[in-house]
């Protein structure tokens, strides 16, 4: 293989692989509105939780990881401004992404990381990146920006707590997707249909 052929083949390979990322990166806003899409991510999170339920020592973290509180007061949620809902979901997703990445690093540094556990964590990292892109396409990031006339004191800080095991991290991930993310995307999709 000559020196000139190698860059040409790399370019060709890049062009062939480029479309693999396009369905998520250039995702239409309607994709997240298809309940099957969100259900797939919820199922992956639940599978991760189930896979980690049986392990004890190997699934404990050497330090606590901060995650978003997933409890939802439905009465208060329905009365929240769209921007506040978007902010809570966007901040929660960002914190959850950081938590999963931190869990991934702690798992990789553990004495004997299981390949199966590593696979579930890797799926969660990938899933959160995809969900972030889908929410961005839906406009959640723009909605999460506070209005100029909104007072800084009106924004409530994101409630958080700490987890110390991989199972609790996956449970939080699953609950966040089933709760706040599902509520927000459902309402955002209904607004888009109007």
From Swiss-Prot:
GO biological process: cell surface receptor signaling pathway via STAT; cellular hyperosmotic response; embryo implantation; erythrocyte differentiation; erythrocyte maturation; erythropoietin-mediated signaling pathway; hemoglobin biosynthetic process; myeloid cell apoptotic process
SUPFAM superfamilies named in the record: 4-helical cytokines
Disulfide links within the chain: 33-189, 55-59
Tissue expression per record: Produced by kidney or liver of adult mammals and by liver of fetal or neonatal mammals.
Pfam family, one: EPO_TPO
Cellular compartments per GO CC: cell surface; extracellular space
Signal peptide per UniProt: 1-26
Main subcellular localisation: secreted
Protein location: Secreted
Keyword Signal: yes
Superkingdom, taxonomy of origin: Eukaryota
GO molecular function, one term: cytokine activity
InterPro entries xref list: 4_helix_cytokine-like_core, EPO/TPO_CS, EPO_TPO, Erythroptn
Gene3D superfamilies: 1.20.1250.10
Glycosylation sites: 50, 64, 109, 172
UniProt entry keywords in alphabetical sequence: Disulfide bond, Erythrocyte maturation, Glycoprotein, Hormone, Secreted, Signal
Similarity remark: Belongs to the EPO/TPO family.
PANTHER family xref list: ERYTHROPOIETIN (PTHR10370:SF0)
Record's function text: Hormone involved in the regulation of erythrocyte proliferation and differentiation and the maintenance of a physiological level of circulating erythrocyte mass. Binds to EPOR leading to EPOR dimerization and JAK2 activation thereby activating specific downstream effectors, including STAT1 and STAT3.
Protein name per Swiss-Prot or TrEMBL: Erythropoietin
């Amino acid at each position: 293989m000559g020196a000139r052929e190698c860059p040409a083949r790399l370019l060709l390979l890049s062009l062939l692989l480029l479309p693999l990322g396009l369905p998520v990166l250039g995702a239409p806003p309607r994709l997240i509105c298809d309940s099957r899409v969100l259900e797939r991510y919820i199922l992956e999170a639940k599978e991760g939780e189930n896979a980690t339920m049986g392990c004890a020592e190997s699934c404990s973290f050497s330090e606590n990881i901060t995650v978003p509180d997933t409890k939802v007061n439905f009465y208060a949620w329905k009365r929240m401004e769209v921007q506040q809902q978007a902010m809570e979901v966007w901040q929660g997703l960002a914190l959850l992404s950081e938590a999963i990445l931190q869990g991934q690093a702690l798992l990789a540094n553990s004495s004997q990381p299981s390949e199966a556990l590593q696979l579930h964590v890797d799926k969660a990292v990938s899933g959160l990146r995809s969900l972030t892109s889908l929410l961005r396409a839906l406009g959640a990031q723009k909605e999460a920006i506070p209005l100029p006339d909104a007072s800084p004191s009106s924004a409530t800080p994101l409630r958080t707590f700490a987890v110390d095991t991989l199972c609790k991290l996956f449970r939080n991930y699953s609950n966040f997707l089933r709760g706040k993310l599902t509520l927000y995307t459902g309402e955002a999709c209904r607004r888009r249909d109007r």
